[in-house]
């Protein structure tokens, strides 16, 4: 079966060579194409006359300060250039008396869309796109669980995934690449600001850094919220493909979508990490520039700003960390003399084994009457009663020993019936126990 997902690299290379594709757009040509695209969107029939194109080129020519005398000739050259590069299609016949009709090609739409609409990357747009994807994948997974022949899978599973979900993933991926370009532009703006007035530059840099960081985190939170659910739905479809060798094309599409989704989500976190590093770099640069101001450039600017304060008021932000005092005397020698005297009873040492033996003997004596008289042992009540007699530091050891000794005596009949007991508080510090009443003793 021919691969329906993508062409191979050699096929694409030969296809490009046979059609002699080539792209070359100068700034004025690109502006002309964008003007055509925007004007075309306002047309109901999508058709453009040559006079329309010349009028649009006139606007471009005025912005680029080009000569009016050669306008018609340059407009014709620009139109022919866009037709040659397949950005425009020209239609003419003997009935139109030399008047041609133009339509923008898919290539022209794609290039213009990249520069115009793809810059509108926001959390709202991303949320809507992910919502559409979730609905499409949900319907596809429901259809996959119904089963059916290859035709059914192709129409109800493969088609929506390939022509809706995959295209939206590609759109999100392209938007993310636009965000990369936007970050580079912000870095260039910050570099320009740092060469200007210092106190204004620092404030503007902080604003740019904070806005970009906030946008990246907001977009990443949106992706993370939907990513796991989308992956789960794709796995749900993939599980329906087990044993269906005739549906390999669907399985390959699922794998491609999973890779695209992983790439989209990982991009967000990588972008945040890189931006955090850049944020720190900018702040370090500012601090270093101030600390290593050998020529006193910053000092001169500060003095000049103070002199001109009433003409150009400004705010000064200061921060001072509390000093850490070193109370140690550097000349103090280590005192190795032995301490003499008696320790308080609270500090006297008792080995852990001695303490445990004492507690065990006490608990055995306390629990023995329950077995002798056949009384049930409510561990919660016993623990609560006994722990009240000991300091908090020994509660853990006492509770463990009580439970060990009680379990040796017998078991709870409710345990064999799989009845889960409720949690009971056993001290005032939040400790709780979950245990059924022991009512069956060992013989």
From Swiss-Prot:
The record's region (Leucine-zipper) falls at 209-237
Q: Which CDD domains match?
A: MukF_C (cd16337), MukF_N (cd16335)
Give the domain of life: Bacteria
Quick one: where is this thing mainly located? cytoplasm
- Could you tell me the keywords of this UniProt record? Calcium, Cell cycle, Cell division, Chromosome partition, Cytoplasm, DNA condensation
Please give an example of a GO cellular component term from this record. cytoplasm
InterPro entries from the UniProt entry: Chromosome_partition_MukF (IPR005582), MukF_C (IPR033441), MukF_C_sf (IPR038198), MukF_M (IPR033440), MukF_M_sp (IPR036141), MukF_WHTH (IPR033439), WH-like_DNA-bd_sf (IPR036388), WH_DNA-bd_sf (IPR036390)
Q: Which GO terms describe its biological process?
A: cell division; chromosome condensation; chromosome segregation; DNA replication
Places the protein is found: Cytoplasm, Nucleoid
Give one Pfam family: MukF_C
GO MF terms listed in the record are: calcium ion binding
**What does this protein do, in the record's words?**
Involved in chromosome condensation, segregation and cell cycle progression. May participate in facilitating chromosome segregation by condensation DNA from both sides of a centrally located replisome during cell division. Not required for mini-F plasmid partitioning. Probably acts via its interaction with MukB and MukE. Overexpression results in anucleate cells. It has a calcium binding activity.
Oligomer and partners: Interacts, and probably forms a ternary complex, with MukE and MukB via its C-terminal region. The complex formation is stimulated by calcium or magnesium. It is required for an interaction between MukE and MukB.
Q: Which family does it belong to?
A: Belongs to the MukF family.
Please identify the protein, giving its name as recorded: Chromosome partition protein MukF
Q: Which organism is it from?
A: Actinobacillus pleuropneumoniae serotype 7 (strain AP76)
Q: Which gene encodes it?
A: mukF
